[in-house]
């Protein structure tokens, strides 16, 4: 009997030891997680949360670190996602379509903007170009695969201009801006805050934008699919912090403007102009948005900028944002 008791006691001790090891391993695995967040040059609640340190504050509770990477436009986000160097980001409509067609594993987890005026085609104040028709034979700077890229080609198609009749120069914003200012290019297809910056400060003219063309450029929060499957609770936490920043911006607009002007080295008037063009949201990706995205994807396929047809609803998962917003 005593011998049997000793065996049982030993077995129980081993079980408790193994359970403790398993718990310790799981805990250390969580502590080893680093959330990699991408950010662009736009004025987004993502930037506010970064400057406030809210992501670090929230993820620290889980023993999780945060790493930030800045990108010039949407397409480079997906190169980083493909190589596991990015877990979250905020991008426009065209980059997600290109990435889906390329087979990159990402998920649209929320819709954050439904902008129309925030993307357009700029020309210099003294330019003789007054409409899209005048772009024939001209040099136009644009970031390949961006929302502005989509808008440019939609504008050309609407006016019956063959893409071969314009000289499209593919430049990221940090390259396109000096090229535009120096006159090396005749026009620049771009988004805010660059549009507001150049129209207010430099007298540039917008010859067309999403509102005039009836072309929206929605933005999305995205997550690396594998990361989202492995850490759904962190996806929800990410969305809660974004929502916190969005709500805070609405309630503390003057202070938010100061943060944006300081971070981007631009005037308060430019920030206000950007906000007049678009206000941030955090909502599920609706059926209407998916349908608009499908039209854009079909157009991109017809144009030849993506090599295969896609179904845009396949990359949408609203479950995270529905939980995050509901839990407010």
Language-model features, listed with the residues they occupy:
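Short, low-complexity disordered leader/linker segments with a strong preference
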Residues: 1-34, 324-328
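Pocket-flanking alpha-helical
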Residues: 46-49, 69-108, 117-130, 150, ...
